[in-house]
């Protein structure tokens, strides 16, 4: 056969295999693949999410996915056309029909009819065959491949195969038969893979190799695995696959084999007594491991089968059948009558019609303040001595039917007619009794009897309107002997401190509060620390027995002298009252100024002045400013100056060099009112310089020599003794010759002076940052002529900061940047450290030539500098002869 013949044969084969290549494609017409669809379901109860089948809608190429709408809201059509159950459905008739709508690109509504048929063994487009057991079983056929570009009327959707759990058998039990259309052409062998087929435990699902019957070999448990996914395979006798693997989903349908279980055996809650109907108390919860999505086997319904006690009504509580919330059904909860209710709660599946279990709910009725406290008895009598506070008068008792030790039981007592707040009632937390006490002392002379009205309530307010219980308390005041009362309790009297002795200062008396008792009062002084006062015991007149002194710091504080006076009556027993007498002593200028200190040491050489403070115990204006003067010839050797403007201190210093030893200085001080006083200061002159640190008193060595000399020369001549004395006086006078303050001018020439010893200083903070006009980031460009320029990254320099405290960091960081600069030394180049403007031109090194002329070494100008530079001029000046 020639090449043209082979080409023609191949073309015919291609046309025979692919007819769409040999004719023009049909035009696209939007619409459903069929006018109606029929899907068969295995039973009347359809669980939620069950796949029923698939409808197809051709919207032509390029159009978006179609949106389907079912006129029966119990079913849902997904965008891929798969029809599922939206919520559990029960088919009352063997057949159910509804419409599914879709819209084309022109918004034209298109519809198709969907019919559901109830059949035990079905498939909507497969024939039925008898199973080996003689029952009619579903047959699944491998889907064939699609050919051409024409619109397909229907797509293959394999609905899940349902298998009830807990089946009794006999096993193996046939589920479905797998068929291949290639059985007419060749012998086909079938196999399955997937869960429990070829994975452990192997063999739960098997398939007959030649007939394609899919079987289950044992009962299934939905609570363990609810869905199995298997793949069926078809191969020819030579082992070649003739069909694509087909997915088979086996859904284990639930059986009501588990009863609900409560989360607790006993539920506990509380409710307030008097709660209104509808008040929620608690919620009980039960669970069921059966299928709660597709069946009612886990739909739990709650009930209350029993109540204990069944009073005052047999149904005091109700429970929501679906949620398990227990609430109050009727009024009548009373803690005092029935404090606790025990309920039997039942939970049953199938919405309360199936398997059931029970639990216990215990409801405690909480107390509310629905019972008012009552006095028992309602009349009380008590007595209390006068003037005593916090004294118990009587005990009040109440009864309360509410729960003890709760706010609804705890009593609160109130005295209704006690406007002056003279009484209080304290509640005992254990017995709830109230103790009536006096809040402050009562006065028998003012009132002998009180009639009180006491009301009682609770800490918690009443839940309902209740009458308030009251009691009547009669309180008798007992008269006692009261102490006399000084009027006023504290008396202040102002007298001068030079008040005469024996004169009456004041009269300080007390009154007798017991008006019904005619008693006599006597007075005496209880405390008089300075023994300055005396009192008339009958009249209470106080007079002086000694001179008063305001400056007595041991007894007088802030010019006030305090004395305590007591008054005693003749009652039985006697009572004593106390009064305080405050004597304010007016100042009198009876004290002269006194210097402090009065003893001091001076150095003989370069003595330091001493500060003398002036003290005056009197008060202004009897004090500063003071006047000071030296008396009795003290001004010859000493001077005084005022140290401050107020003239309250002096500066004492010697006029000349004094002899070693003790000196007496008479200092006269005068206050502002011309009160003067002369004080002698003891001054010792020490053998030291400047400030006295360790004063060594001079030993009279020379004077000591006179006595031994006189004793040694018993037979000497008086003239020889006088001569020796004259010689000693001459030697002493030479020793005390004053040295000049400054050495002669010639002696200072060879002294060495250190002028650079300035001691420690502080860091200079007074500088202007603006003077740093150019930082490293703005330094002038440096051109190098000795090295070839290279392309290198220029280091980044930190700009000059505005904060002066950052100058140190600024210098350190830029120094590090300069050290890492690759263009920096050791290369020879011009380095610019800081540009400060143009400067004066400096001479070059070549200009520093060695001079051979005498003019270059002219040092004659040194002669003008005086004698101290004469030697320097002689050394370097030279003459023409040199």
Curated annotation (Swiss-Prot):
Posttranslational mods: During apoptosis or with calcium influx, cleaved by a membrane-bound metalloproteinase (ADAM10), PS1/gamma-secretase and caspase-3. Processing by the metalloproteinase, induced by calcium influx, causes disruption of cell-cell adhesion and the subsequent release of beta-catenin into the cytoplasm. The residual membrane-tethered cleavage product is rapidly degraded via an intracellular proteolytic pathway. Cleavage by caspase-3 releases the cytoplasmic tail resulting in disintegration of the actin microfilament system. N-glycosylation at Asn-637 is essential for expression, folding and trafficking. Addition of bisecting N-acetylglucosamine by MGAT3 modulates its cell membrane location.
Residues in compartment: Extracellular: 155-709
Cytoplasmic-side positions: 731-882
Modified residues (Phosphotyrosine): 753-755
Chain intervals for the UniProt region annotation (Required for binding CTNND1 and PSEN1): 758-769
Post-translational modification Phosphoserine, affected residues: 770, 793, 838, 840, 846
Annotated site location: Cleavage: 700-701, 731-732, 750-751
Segments crossing the lipid bilayer: 710-730
Subcellular localization(s) per the UniProt record: Cell junction, Adherens junction; Cell membrane; Endosome; Golgi apparatus, trans-Golgi network
Domain Cadherin: 154-262, 263-375, 376-486, 487-595, 594-702
Keyword Signal tagged: yes
Cellular component aspect of the GO annotation: adherens junction; apical junction complex; catenin complex; cell junction; cell-cell junction; cytoplasm; desmosome; endosome
GO biological process entries: adherens junction organization; calcium-dependent cell-cell adhesion via plasma membrane cell adhesion molecules; cell migration; cell morphogenesis; cell-cell adhesion mediated by cadherin; cell-cell junction assembly; desmosome assembly; homophilic cell adhesion via plasma membrane adhesion molecules
Pfam families for this protein: CADH_Y-type_LIR, Cadherin, Cadherin_pro
Propeptide positions: 24-154
Skewed-composition ranges (Acidic residues): 755-767
Stretches for region Required for binding alpha, beta and gamma catenins: 811-882
Keywords noted in UniProt: Calcium, Cell adhesion, Cell junction, Cell membrane, Cleavage on pair of basic residues, Cytoplasm, Disulfide bond, Endosome, Glycoprotein, Golgi apparatus, Membrane, Metal-binding, Phosphoprotein, Repeat, Signal, Transmembrane, Transmembrane helix, Ubl conjugation
Broad class of where this protein is predominantly found: other
Sites where a glycan is attached: 280, 285, 358, 470, 472, 509, 558, 576, 578, 580, 637
Domain comment quoted from the record: Three calcium ions are usually bound at the interface of each cadherin domain and strengthen the connections, imparting a strong curvature to the full-length ectodomain.
Function, in words: Cadherins are calcium-dependent cell adhesion proteins. They preferentially interact with themselves in a homophilic manner in connecting cells; cadherins may thus contribute to the sorting of heterogeneous cell types. CDH1 is involved in mechanisms regulating cell-cell adhesions, mobility and proliferation of epithelial cells. Promotes organization of radial actin fiber structure and cellular response to contractile forces, via its interaction with AMOTL2 which facilitates anchoring of radial actin fibers to CDH1 junction complexes at the cell membrane. E-Cad/CTF2 promotes non-amyloidogenic degradation of Abeta precursors. Has a strong inhibitory effect on APP C99 and C83 production.
Assembly with partners or alone: Homodimer; disulfide-linked. Component of an E-cadherin/ catenin adhesion complex composed of at least E-cadherin/CDH1, beta-catenin/CTNNB1 or gamma-catenin/JUP, and potentially alpha-catenin/CTNNA1; the complex is located to adherens junctions. Found in a complex composed of CDH1, RAP1A and PKP3; PKP3 acts as a scaffold protein within the complex, the complex is required for CDH1 localization to mature desmosome cell junctions. Interacts with the TRPV4 and CTNNB1 complex. Interacts with CTNND1.
Name of this protein: Cadherin-1
Organism (species): Bos taurus
Lineage: Eukaryota, Metazoa, Chordata, Craniata, Vertebrata
């Amino acid at each position: 056969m020639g090449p043209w013949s082979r080409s023609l044969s191949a073309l015919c084969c291609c046309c025979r295999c692919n007819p769409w290549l040999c004719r023009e494609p049909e035009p696209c017409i939007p619409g459903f693949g069929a006018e109606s669809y029929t899907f068969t379901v295995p039973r009347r109860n359809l669980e939620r999410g069950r796949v029923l089948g698939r409808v197809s809608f051709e919207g032509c190429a390029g159009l978006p996915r179609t949106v389907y709408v079912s006129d029966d809201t119990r079913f849902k059509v997904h965008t891929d056309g798969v029809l599922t159950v939206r919520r559990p459905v029960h088919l009352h008739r063997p057949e159910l029909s509804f419409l599914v709508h879709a819209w084309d690109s022109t918004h034209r509504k298109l519809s198709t009819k969907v019919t559901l048929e109830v059949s035990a063994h079905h498939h909507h487009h497969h024939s039925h065959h008898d199973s080996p057991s003689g029952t009619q079983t579903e047959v699944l056929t491998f889907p064939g491949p699609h050919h051409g570009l024409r619109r397909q009327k229907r797509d293959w959707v394999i609905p899940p195969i349902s298998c009830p759990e807990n089946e009794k058998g006999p096993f193996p039990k046939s589920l479905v038969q797998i068929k291949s259309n290639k059985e007419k052409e060749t012998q086909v062998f079938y196999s399955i893979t997937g869960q429990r087929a070829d994975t452990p435990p192997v063999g739960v699902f098997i398939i007959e190799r030649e007939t394609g019957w899919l079987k289950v070999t044992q009962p299934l448990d939905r609570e363990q695995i609810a869905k199995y996914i298997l793949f069926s395979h078809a191969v020819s006798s030579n082992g070649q696959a003739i069909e694509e693997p087909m997915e088979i989903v086996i859904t284990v349908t639930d059986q009501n084999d588990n009863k609900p279980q409560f989360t607790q055996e006993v539920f506990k809650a509380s409710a307030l007594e008097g709660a209104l109907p509808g008040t929620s108390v608690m919620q009980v919860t039960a669970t069921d491991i059966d299928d709660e999505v597709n069946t009612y086997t886990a739909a739990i319904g709650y009930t209350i089968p029993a109540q204990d006690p069944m009073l005052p009504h047999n149904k005091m509580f109700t429970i929501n059948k679906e949620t398990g919330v227990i609430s109050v059904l009727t009024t009548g909860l009373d803690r005092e009558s029935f404090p606790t209710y025990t309920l039997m709660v039942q939970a049953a599946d199938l919405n309360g019609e199936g398997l059931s279990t029970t639990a216990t709910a215990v409801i405690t009725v909480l107390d509310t303040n629905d019972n008012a406290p009552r006095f028992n008895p309602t009349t009380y009598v008590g007595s209390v001595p006068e003037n005593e506070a916090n004294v118990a008068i009587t005990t009040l008792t109440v009864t309360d039917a509410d729960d003890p030790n709760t706010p609804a039981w705890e009593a609160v007592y109130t005295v209704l007619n006690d406007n002056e707040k003279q009484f209080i009632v304290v509640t005992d937390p254990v017995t709830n009794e109230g103790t009536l006490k006096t809040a402050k002392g009562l006065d028998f002379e003012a009132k002998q009897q009180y009639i009180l009205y006491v009301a009682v309530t609770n800490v918690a307010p009443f839940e309902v309107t209740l009458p308030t219980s009251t009691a009547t308390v009669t309180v008798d005041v007992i008269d006692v002997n009261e102490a006399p009362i000084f009027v006023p309790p504290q008396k202040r009297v102002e007298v001068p401190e030079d008040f005469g002795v024996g004169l009456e200062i004041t009269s300080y008396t007390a009154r007798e509060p017991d008006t019904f008792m005619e008693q006599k009062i006597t007075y005496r002084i209880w405390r008089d620390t300075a023994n300055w006062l005396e009192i008339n015991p009958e009249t209470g007149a106080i007079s002086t027995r000694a001179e008063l002194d305001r400056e007595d710091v041991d007894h007088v504080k802030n010019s006030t002298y305090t004395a305590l006076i007591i008054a005693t009556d003749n009652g039985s027993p006697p009572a004593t009252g106390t009064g305080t007498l405050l004597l304010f002593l007016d100042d009198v200028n009876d004290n002269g100024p006194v210097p402090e200190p009065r003893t001091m040491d001076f150095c003989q050489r370069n003595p330091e002045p001493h500060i003398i403070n002036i003290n005056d115990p009197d008060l202004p204006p009897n004090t500063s400013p003071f006047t000071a003067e030296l008396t009795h010839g003290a001004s010859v050797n000493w001077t005084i100056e005022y140290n401050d403007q107020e003239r309250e201190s002096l500066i004492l210093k010697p006029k000349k060099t004094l002899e070693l030893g003790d000196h007496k200085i008479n200092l006269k001080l005068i206050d502002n009112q011309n009160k003067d006083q002369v004080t002698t200061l003891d001054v010792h002159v020490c053998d030291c310089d400047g400030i006295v640190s360790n004063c060594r008193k001079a030993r009279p060595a020379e004077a000591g020599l006179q006595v031994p000399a006189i004793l040694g020369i018993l037979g000497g001549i008086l003239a020889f003794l006088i001569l020796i004395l004259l010689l000693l006086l001459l030697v002493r006078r030479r020793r005390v010759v004053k040295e000049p303050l400054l050495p002669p001018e010639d002696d200072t020439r060879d002294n060495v002076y250190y002028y650079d010893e300035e001691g420690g200083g502080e860091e200079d903070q007074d500088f202007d940052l603006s003077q740093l006009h150019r930082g490293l980031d703005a330094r002038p460009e440096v051109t190098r002529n000795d090295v070839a320029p290279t392309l290198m990254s220029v280091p980044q320099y930190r700009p000059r900061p505005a904060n002066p405290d950052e100058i140190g960091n600024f210098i350190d960081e830029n120094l590090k940047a300069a050290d890492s600069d690759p263009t920096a030394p050791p290369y020879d180049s011009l380095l610019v450290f800081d540009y400060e403007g143009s400067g004066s031109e400096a001479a070059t090194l070549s200009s520093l030539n060695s001079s051979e002329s005498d003019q270059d070494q002219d040092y004659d100008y040194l002669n003008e500098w005086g004698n101290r530079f004469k030697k320097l001029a002689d050394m370097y000046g030279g003459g023409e002869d040199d």
